[in-house]
Amino acid sequence: MNKTILWSFLLFFSGSQTSRATDQKIADFAVDLYKAISLSHKNNIIFSPLGTTMLLGMVQLGAKGKAQQQILKTLRMRGTPAGEEFSVLKSLFSAISKKKQEFTFNLASALYLQEGFIVKETYLHSNKEFFQSATKLVDFLDAKTSAQAISTWVESKTDGKIKNMFSEEEFGPLTRLVLVNAIYFKGDWKQKFRKEDTEMTDFTKKDGSTVKVPMMKALLRAQYGYFSQSSMTCQVLELPYKADEFSLVIILPTEDTSIEEVENQVTAPHVRRWFSELHEEEVEVSLPRFKIEQKLDLKEALYSLNVTEIFSGGCDLSGITDSSEVYVSRVMQKVFFEINEDGSEAAASTGINIPAIMSLTQTQFLANHPFLFILKHIRTESILFMGKVTDPDIQTTKGRDLDSL
């Protein structure tokens, strides 16, 4: 892969260093991928656009012809100005690593290839340099050993938070190349919730039934907005994490707007507008405590976004290996994400206790029904996670993007 295209890919991650058009591509791909995944996932969803882009970048490093062009088109990178030798991806990870004491962010990415194929040295070097990713050979014919080896590697890279990522049933004699992405994040709120204020409250699910969930409550100074367009009306709240490196943006449909209406109508311009037009005010926040662990095979979602060639026999991955028998078998991502009251005892400020009788004039943000969320890196506005909560009581979901295929 030539350096011009490589630098174009790296510039894809830029927030402050490149044009506004580059920023837009990040949100564009995130929303596209969310819609593709949500076609078959009607309940809780979480995925990482950043992680998925890294996986596609790892393939693109060694792809040529149609395979490469499909990835470029899906990421909206065709025609991206090139020539600036500055890796924003490296900058992002550098920024994260400098403040590790403030939060936990573990991202493990790897390319696993069937033993017997020879990986080119240039690819090994570039994959490690630009994506901090491992390239490993395994024998997928020994499915049990391969599953154990990959799962153990993922567990070690995520401080034990993501376990048992693979089972032997997921590999077979036709498995050639598997892309693996595992991500864990946990941060301390800049303004934490008081645990003594959390109480069991009804959460109304999409079907109208209710479930009791632990609802965190606090009076916070937060970035807030109320947006109405066509039949989509929602409240948007941004809660920063300690050190102002990351923030959680929650998109809460009003009671007369369903989560499906938001999913159908939301676009990248909506997301960018939400990011830019929030204003600070005092908000009475009620947010359910939840934990989501989700494993996705992104193959079908990428298929629906017209990334198809890399999954076909005979695709040109000659930048990785000279063999014409190599193609991508699976694109696997597993994310562990948790929202709770916890914050740093020493430095984090605390939300104010909400009185039993709330002010009628106070802005209220009551997340007691399904909502979307985005975890972003504040400086670059890179979207690390995107998802939805339809039932905070469900903690673990697994499956393929299109179970019918």
Swiss-Prot record:
PROSITE patterns, sorted:
SERPIN
Name its cellular compartments: Secreted
* The keyword ATP-binding is assigned to this record: no
A GO molecular-function annotation: serine-type endopeptidase inhibitor activity
This protein's name: Serpin I2
> What PANTHER family does the annotation carry?
SERINE PROTEASE INHIBITOR, SERPIN (PTHR11461), SERPIN I2 (PTHR11461:SF51)
What is the native source organism of this protein? Mus musculus
Concerning InterPro entries, the annotation shows: Serpin_CS, Serpin_dom, Serpin_fam, Serpin_sf, Serpin_sf_1, Serpin_sf_2
Q: Hey, where's the site called Reactive bond on this chain?
A: I357, M358
Q: Which domain of life is it from?
A: Eukaryota
Key words of the record: Glycoprotein, Protease inhibitor, Secreted, Serine protease inhibitor, Signal
Signal peptide as annotated in the record: 1-18
Glycosylation site list = N306
GO CC entries: collagen-containing extracellular matrix; extracellular space
Expression tissues: Expressed in pancreas.
Give the family, as the similarity comment puts it. Belongs to the serpin family.
